[in-house]
Amino acid sequence: ALDRTVSFGAETLEGFFWEHAFSERAEFRAEVHAAATLEAALPGRLGVVKLLARSDTLAPDAFLAAARAELDELVSATHSAPGIALVEMSAPGVHKAATLAEFAASRGVAPADVVAFGDMPNDLEMLQWAGLGLAVASGHPSLLAAADGVVGACDDDGVAATVERLLELPTD
């Protein structure tokens, strides 16, 4: 069913563009270009990096599931904002794992030698790609279930404590 509360925004190479309804509800503020519709807000042909959709009526996971059901073959859809029904869509195959794989390969680092940390669904592919994928204890249930291990929560500096432990050199 069509959800008339959905509003749209876009992250481009030139900045943020979104509908007035999207920016009125945004918890984050940035310099944006807003108009009645996203089409009106986007001047000409900009390199859209990410299309954003926001719902006022669906829970974040339900909105993501609905978006994936409708758009799965067209875009990579995910979400990264806890408690906000904000779906982030990009070209298929564009996600953190792809960028991390490219970066690691450019430096001759094998996936088995990579440790990745994540807390939200937008980190899932990255955790699956890395040799050691660790979820933050305060993270999304899907990451906690898929990770190789769990580190302390964000409020407990879980990532920092784990990095410090991993970098310790043997004393003997």
Model feature map: region roles:
Residues M89-D172:
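Mg2+-dependent phosphoryl-transfer enzymes with acidic/Ser/Thr/Gly-rich catalytic loops
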Residues L2-F117, P121-N122:
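Conserved acidic, metal-coordinating active-site core of Asp-based
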Residues A1-L2, L144:
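Anion (oxyanion) recognition and catalysis
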